[in-house]
């Protein structure tokens, strides 16, 4: 997008219970507001991504065994990926909040395919234990919605939100 930025950890406890969309939105707001306290003259972006499968919120795996269990759950099924973003600009008293939802249909994958995938990708730092941009074709059948949302941030909507907040990049 051509925007210079710096990453500042929010260092806050994340909400992990309730409706998956509300979890993502509440975490994004909390992250943005925590950082905006120290950077009131800058536009701050807080984001959170949550995966939902059949009513269950799926986060990052605790270990490789947990990653294999998560990938087995996702096998052959469609799940939602929701990313919420909160833009906070305290100096201008602006706040913009939105969420983007995409869906991912997994291929039916067996234990050998799961082991192979885990051996190639650092699954421990990824919600759902996978990354669409890293060997995703081995486990993903189809994607509906924004691929950028699944990979990281929904840049299409983010560009519009930045302009709406008066940020000209």
Regions found by a protein language model. Give the residues of each.
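N-terminal beta1-alpha1 ligand-phosphate binding loop
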Residues: 1-3
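A short beta-strand-loop structural module common to alpha/beta enzyme folds
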Residues: 5-14
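Anionic-ligand binding patches
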Residues: 7, 18-169
């Amino acid at each position: 997008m051509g925007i210079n930025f710096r990453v500042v950890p929010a260092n806050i406890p994340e909400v992990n219970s309730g409706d998956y969309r509300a979890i993502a939105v509440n975490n994004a707001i909390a992250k943005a507001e925590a950082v905006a306290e120290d950077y009131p003259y800058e536009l701050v972006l807080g984001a959170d991504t949550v995966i939902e499968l059949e009513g269950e919120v799926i986060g990052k795996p605790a270990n490789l065994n947990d990653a294999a269990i998560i990938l087995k759950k996702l096998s052959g099924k469609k799940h939602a990926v929701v990313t919420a973003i909160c833009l906070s600009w305290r100096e201008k008293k602006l706040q913009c909040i939105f969420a983007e939802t995409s869906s991912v249909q997994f291929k039916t994958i067996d234990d050998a395919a799961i082991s192979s995938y885990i051996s190639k990708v650092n699954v421990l730092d990824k919600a759902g234990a996978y990354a669409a941009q890293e060997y995703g074709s081995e486990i993903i059948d189809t994607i509906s919605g924004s691929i950028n949302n699944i990979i990281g941030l929904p840049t299409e909507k983010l560009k519009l939100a930045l302009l709406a907040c008066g940020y000209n990049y």
